[in-house]
Each structure stands twice: as C-alpha cells, then as structure tokens.
From Swiss-Prot:
InterPro entries: Alpha-1_3/4-FUT_pln, Glyco_tran_10_C, Glyco_trans_10, GT10-like_C_sf
Transmembrane segments: 5-27
EC numbers on record: 2.4.1.-
Annotated tissue distribution: Present in root, stem, flower buds and green siliques.
Positions in the Lumenal compartment: 28-401
Species: Arabidopsis thaliana (Mouse-ear cress)
Name this protein carries in UniProt: Alpha-(1,4)-fucosyltransferase
Membrane-side (Cytoplasmic) residue stretches: 1-4
A biological-process GO annotation: protein glycosylation
Underlying gene: FUT13
Pfam family, one: Glyco_transf_10
Superkingdom of the source species: Eukaryota
Family: Belongs to the glycosyltransferase 10 family.
Predominant cellular place of this UniProt entry's protein: Golgi
SUPFAM superfamilies: UDP-Glycosyltransferase/glycogen phosphorylase
Amino acid sequence: MPMRYLNAMAALLMMFFTLLILSFTGILEFPSASTSMEHSIDPEPKLSDSTSDPFSDVLVAYKKWDFEVGCARFRENHKDAILGNVSSGSLQEFGCGKLKMKHVKVLVKGWTWIPDNLENLYSCRCGMTCLWTKSSVLADSPDALLFETTTPPLQRRVGDPLRVYMELEAGRKRSGREDIFISYHAKDDVQTTYAGSLFHNNRNYHISPHKNNDVLVYWSSSRCLPHRDRLAKSLLDLIPHHSFGKCLNNVGGLDSALSMYPECVAEHNAEAKWYDHLHCAMSHYKFVLAIENTAVESYVTEKLFYALDSGSVPIYFGASNVQDFVPPHSVIDGSKFGSMQELAAYVKRLGDDPVAYSEYHAWRRCGLMGNYGKTRAVSLDTLPCRLCEEISRRGGKNAGV
C-alpha cells in the first residue's frame, strides 16, 4: 500500500479519536432530540410548577414577564399570527379597481338599533365619499335603502335604490328580498363584527392597575337563558367570582359595581347606567367569563370584545373559530378543556402566576394583533364606507335586477 494512503488513514484515525474524546468531555456537543427540545421556544407559556406567586399589581407582573420572556420571544412564538391567516375565510379586503361610483348615498329605513351617531358624510378609501343617514331630506335620491328590523320591498326595478338587509343575530337569515346582505359570517356580502367602539363612546374607560386577588372572575348577565346560566354556574361554583346583573347575582343587587368601585362613576353622569361603567368594573378582575347566547361559527359578540377592551382575560364559550377573530394568545377557550374542573384549576393557577398571566396581555403590549386587526377593520365602525364601496361595485341604482 503506498505510503500516502497510510498517512491519510492515520490522520483520519487521529481525528476520529480526538472528536470522540471531546464529545465525552462535553467540550463538543452534538445536536440531539433532547438538546433541541431544551433550547426550543415553547409556543405557549408554561405555568410554574413552583409555589404560587399571587399578585394584584399588573404593572409589576408585566415587568416580570418582560424580564423572563419579552416581546422578541413572543413575536417569534406567534410569527404565524403576523400573517393573519383566517381559517374560516373572509374578514374582507377588496381593492379599488371595480368601483363604479365616487359618491354613494345610503338611506336607513325604519327603526334600527344602530346609534344615530353613525350618521355622517364619510371620506372613504379609493377617493370615495359616503352619506349614511336616516333623513330622506339629506338623502333625497338614495343609491341604497338599508333595512334591519323591517323587510325590504318585494321587487326592485333598474333605477330604484338597491335593497340592503342587515341581520347580526346568531340565527342570521336573509330576507329573500335584498340585493346586499350584511351579517357576521364570511359568506355574507358585507361581513361585520362587533369589535368596534361605536356603541360605547361615553363609557368610563378607566383601567385599574390592580386586580382582585381573592375574587378572580367577573360575570354579568341579565338575560337569564337556562342553558347559559347552567354553563356559567358549573364553572363559577368552582372559582371565586362576582356575578353582576340579574343572573346568579352574588354581589347584593344590580347596582353594586359603583359602590364597590367608586372610581368607575362616569364624570358626565353620576347616575350612570350599568353599561356606562362596565369596562371599568371588569378591569378589576383578572378574568371575565364571556358566554355567547348561541354557539355558532363566526358569531363572536361584544361579550368577548368588552373583556379584551377592559384589560382582562376572557374565558370564552361560543364560536368554535373564535381564534380567527382575536389577538394571538389572548383568550382562554373553555371548550378546549376536558372538564370544568380542569378549566377551573387552570384559571386558578394562571391567576397566581404573574408571568404566565402577563403572556395573555403581550399582544397589546408588543403590538401583535394578528387576525384582530382585520376583525377591527370590519367592525360596525367602518360599516358605512364598506357598504358604500359594495354599492359602488354594483353600480348603485343602475345595477341589474
């Protein structure tokens, strides 16, 4: 065998034994399944297995989270949420290319629960303007008529205003007479969510920096549906809570919130209604129980969004695709737990873990909205412009029948 081959073999053997020695001494470490798991970033925060650390000051809790986790890691954990993928589709985004009208006039017909302060002349995207009004004087020649509690006309001829029908309740059903249908589902002509702020402009938005330690959960309901009360009771019996409203009330009456939290009195009205101080009262609790009247896909109402606005963590029962509508890691989906006992145990442990609890608020502090950005973008706040755009795409009164 030539000498050069012997030299090569000797060199290889020396390298092999050197690497073997280094690996045994720990100087050189090869990747392994256990090593990569130890150094990977957990997608969800782990609840501490150590002694609980009850807290009431959320600002102190946030600082602990900043030190132990931080926004960079949170963004890495939830980088897919930045794309805002919606499994159930829509949360609409349309371009300007198919618009046929620069100005659209919408006349709202009959009684509607949409507040009057929505009436306005709007400057919309794509150089459009939109008049939304209940006045037939201001909209003397409307391009569309909007109906909610009344049924649109049976027939429409070319040259007549388009017929728009809105139904935002869980059992959403077309009238069969509309040209454009507004509701909460991705399949609807104009999708609209409950995530806006339009309906509570005059509320007290004071957010308490301190959370109750002895009472974890806030719940308020005055429409006492049997199935919802049973569901609420099955969880609340296991967790310290305050129940406001008529259903399962345990705070001594309907108007107890202001005596418990006097800072929640609205400045403009010392005798405010319960909903005027709703967010402020909620903000004193680490968790808010939010149960929809009906569990239907995409039917996500103000019950959930109020809790998010108040700086609390919602415990949610309702739409199976709720994650399509909310910020990343912001909601506890009660349906994902095997039992109420399991859910209650999780909530109690979370309430005593300042770092894991703060993770549920990281989306707001780190500016990671995910799908929630789209949810807010298609709320009732933006409905006038979005409806006018749809009317423009169809050509308004010149649309075919």
